[in-house]
Regions:
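N-terminal amphipathic alpha-helix/helix-capping segment at the start of soluble metabolic enzymes
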Residues: 1-19, 189
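Hydrophobic faces of well-ordered beta-strands that scaffold small-molecule active sites
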Residues: 7-13, 28-32, 58-60, 75-77, ...
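Short, acidic/polar
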Residues: 11-24, 62-65, 102-109, 156-162
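N-terminal active-site wall of soluble small-molecule enzyme domains
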Residues: 18-19, 29-90
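Conserved, mostly hydrophobic/aromatic
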Residues: 30, 67, 110, 118, ...
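Alpha-helix-loop-beta-strand connector modules within alpha/beta enzyme cores
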Residues: 43-59, 82, 87-103, 131-156, ...
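Glycine-rich phosphate-binding active-site loops on the catalytic face of alpha/beta enzymes
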Residues: 75-86, 117-132, 155-189
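Internal catalytic-core helix/loop-beta-alpha segment
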Residues: 94-127
Length: 189
């Protein structure tokens, strides 16, 4: 197994696809989150194998039992999960807890849940949500805490270079990372 440092790039997927990426990104974490239907364990197994082969980190969203069963690199706690707290004594020492937040209250909750990195979103305007943080609010929120923040939401080619102005550890996406090569990702990291 590879070193268990947090990746700089994260990709959200809801199912296994043979060619998840059309590029050669390294330092990538894949987060399996499927909220629309029952968790497909064969998809999880294939994603775990794919990540091992490509030396990517693999995380499961919101299901500690599956994360332990499939020996993932960690768990992703979505912003709507306000109650889970973990006892890391029972987990592998390299097991990472990461989570997402949309505001200061949710950031504090993720800190209480023991998250090592927090996905702060949406940074830019996205189709499904009229509210977004914008560069100024995002930067103010991240400067308050000594934590690794990952930008998420609305990241596109036209605004990728804006990430260089932010206090971030990395970036995450659902579609942008699938299509763009690392050289097109800007110099923000």
């Amino acid at each position: 197994m590879h070193k268990n440092n947090l990746p700089k790039y994260f990709l959200f997927v809801d199912k296994y696809e043979k060619n998840i990426l059309k590029n050669d990104i390294t330092n990538l974490g894949i987060i399996y989150r499927n909220y629309s239907k029952k968790q497909n364990e064969s998809d999880i197994y294939r994603l775990r194998s794919y990540c091992n082969k490509k030396k990517f980190k693999f995380y499961i969203s919101n299901n500690l039992k599956l994360a332990v069963k499939f020996k993932t690199d960690g768990i992703y706690i979505p912003s709507f999960n306000k109650r889970i707290t973990f006892n890391k004594v029972n987990l592998n020492k390299n097991f990472k807890i990461i989570g997402s937040a949309h505001n200061q209250i949710e950031i504090k909750k993720k800190l209480d849940q023991g998250c090592e990195a927090i996905f702060l979103s949406p940074l830019f305007k996205i189709a499904k949500n009229r509210k977004y943080l914008g560069v100024c609010k995002f930067k103010l929120l991240t400067l308050k805490y000594e934590k690794k923040f990952i930008a998420l939401g609305g990241i596109r080619k036209k605004n990728i270079n804006t990430l260089g102005m932010l206090n971030i550890y990395g970036m995450a996406g659902i579609t942008y990372l699938k299509k763009n090569r690392p050289k097109n990702l800007g110099r923000f990291l």
